[in-house]
Regions:
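Plant-biased recognition of short, low-complexity, intrinsically disordered N-terminal tails
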Residues: 1-9, 20, 37, 49-58
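Activation targets extended, charge/polar-rich intrinsically disordered C-terminal tails
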Residues: 2-13, 19-32, 132-208
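Alpha-helical and coiled-coil interaction segments, frequently adjacent to or embedded
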Residues: 13-14, 80
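Short Cys/His-rich micro-motifs in 6-15 aa windows
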Residues: 30-40
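Glycine-rich catalytic cores of cysteine/serine-nucleophile enzymes that process amide/ester linkages
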Residues: 38, 44, 52-115
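Alpha-helical recognition domains of nuclear gene-regulatory proteins
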Residues: 80, 88, 127-130, 155-159
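Surface-exposed beta-strand-to-loop junctions
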Residues: 104-106, 129-136
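A structural motif
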Residues: 117-131
Length: 208
């Protein structure tokens, strides 16, 4: 699990101080943070990253190489998969369909399906089980550019289209624009904060 980001105000209501560990001395006023009162006590900033095994019937994404916090850039290739009701990951790559991958502990969750009923949960599990055995998704059929993980996930969503806005499934570019980019853009703000704190020990942020 990544180091958690904490936010607090010490001496000024105009500036937030973000850090992993509360500094002994306030970077704004230079006073001891242990012996002086804080305007706002430390609280956790919720991370957008999650362990895929804790999700249910969700689209999940992660960098193809490395992880979001330390390696991701806007130019990074992203790998995409789907979880079933038990949080088991179904992914398609050069190995074909892999079930139960363990390297999804730091991913972004995309709730394309919205609020689900028991009927939809059952359909998700059934659809994934069928697709995992379908010859369309064997390693021989995989192509990095024309038949990849995005095609697998989009076909899964088409198969349960009664709970998905099908407009986003018309093309891979439209799917990325409407579904993936909003999630990665929001996560990018957290990742930027994380990296600044990892380098400088804290981040001083103007209150909006």
């Amino acid at each position: 699990m990544e180091t958690e980001i904490r936010c607090f105000q010490h001496c000024s209501r105009d500036w937030n101080i973000l850090c992993f560990t509360i500094p002994d001395v306030c970077p704004l006023c230079g006073h001891d943070t242990m012996t002086t009162e804080m305007r706002i006590p430390p609280y956790l900033i919720q991370s957008p990253l999650t362990d895929a095994n804790t999700t249910q019937c969700c689209v999940v994404i992660k960098p193809t190489i490395g992880c979001f916090l330390t390696d991701y850039t806007n130019q990074s290739n992203l790998h995409i998969a789907v979880t079933n009701t038990a949080g088991v990951v179904y992914e398609f790559d050069e190995r074909g369909v892999t079930v139960g991958g363990s390297d999804w502990t730091q991913c972004l969750q995309v709730n394309v399906l919205g609020i689900l009923s028991e009927t939809v949960y059952k359909k998700c599990d059934e659809t994934l089980a069928i697709m995992a055995q379908n010859e369309t998704w064997t390693k021989e059929k995989y192509n990095e550019f024309s038949h990849n993980c995005y095609d697998f996930v989009m076909q899964f969503l088409r198969n349960i289209s009664n709970v998905v806005k099908t407009g986003c499934l018309e093309s891979r570019s439209l799917f990325c624009e409407q579904v993936i980019v909003p999630v990665t853009s929001k996560a990018g703000k957290y990742i930027s904060m994380y990296r600044t704190i990892a380098t400088d020990r804290y981040l001083i942020q103007k209150v909006a």
